[in-house]
Amino acid sequence: MLYAKALSIGDEIGFFSPSSPATAFAPNRFQRAKAYLKAQGFELVEGSLTGKSDYYRSGSIRERAEELNQLIRDPNVRCIMPTIGGNNSNSLLPYIDYEALRNDPKIIIGYSDVTALLLGIYAQTGLITFYGPALVASFGEYPPLVDETFHSFIDLLCSETNQYQYTMPSSWTDIKHDWETQHSAKPVYPNEWQFIGKGKVTGRIIGGNLNTMAGIWGSRYMPEIKVGDILLIEDSLKGIENVERSFAHLAACGVFERVSAIILGKHELFDNKGTGRTPLDVLIEVLADKNVPIFYGFDSCHTHPMLVTPLGVRGTIDFDNHTFKLEDRWVKAK
């Protein structure tokens, strides 16, 4: 197992665009996100494709891979964060300099389409990666939601402890605003976490964005889901028919027969097609008679605020006391 060093205020965070060109299509939100992290004391290092666009992506496959590799090889960069996800991060996997990352482990964080990179890097190097915020998508949000996301970022990445208990944010949102015309905080909903099961479950946390995992499934970049694992899954902007298909894919692959519990994150702007059903309802139907406990509504997903979750470390869900905590270290001493 490989661990990056914990972050310190003043460290350099490198950002890159592995898929969608957010720095080009959302310049106002991009500038706001940069200003926010700089105001918290971090230095930012721009990736080579900043401000560039090749229609649906920031650059060619090789250009995007080289942008990431430049940050991996920069000894001053201690954390690497995407600007946003998209659909094509998996294209980079054959070209990443894994050896450089083994020699100088860095914090690799992101979510959504970047799941392909998080899991691929973990599978190839053993480096603990982090399901967490992206620069433009997350830190371009307005307070108080962005502050809660940042507090989780600091709690997890600047800490050298080997235990952490998550606290449920009091509110959340998936309300969609035009990024370039948004000028204030979004309305929020009261929060709720649901614990469906009994007793305690401890296992390795693995997973990420459900749709993205399908793009690396069966490859050397997808870590084996082992007996006893805690599966983290979430998705965004999908219809109920696609969610059922994704869950059924996991079932067909025998995943639900191996995992000890499922963490199902909130689904941003879920389209239930008039059924009134939730992703939880769909999951329970697909599970059928499999008695897999579910922690539903965890805020490590596309909604705001976002909680940081290390992948590859041991966690414990207490279904009786409604708690979720980490039981392993996820970074090493500075």
Swiss-Prot record:
InterPro entries listed in its UniProt record: Carboxypeptidase_A_C_sf, Class_I_gatase-like, LdcA_N, Peptidase_S66_N, Peptidase_S66C, S66_fam
Q: Which EC class is the enzyme in?
A: hydrolase
Q: Domain of life here?
A: Bacteria
Q: Which UniProt keywords apply?
A: Carboxypeptidase, Hydrolase, Protease, Serine protease
A GO CC annotation given for this chain: cytosol
List S-S links within the chain. Answer: none
What does UniProt list as catalytic? S112 (nucleophile), E234 (charge relay system), H302 (charge relay system)
Pfam families in UniProt = Peptidase_S66, Peptidase_S66C
Write down the EC number.
Answer: 3.4.16.-
GO biological process terms, alphabetically, are: proteolysis
Extract the GO molecular function terms from the UniProt entry. Answer: carboxypeptidase activity; serine-type peptidase activity
Q: Which PANTHER family match?
A: CARBOXYPEPTIDASE VC_A0337-RELATED, MURAMOYLTETRAPEPTIDE CARBOXYPEPTIDASE
- Write out the similarity annotation: Belongs to the peptidase S66 family.
Q: Name the chain's protein.
A: Putative carboxypeptidase VC_A0337
Source organism (scientific name) = Vibrio cholerae serotype O1 (strain ATCC 39315 / El Tor Inaba N16961)
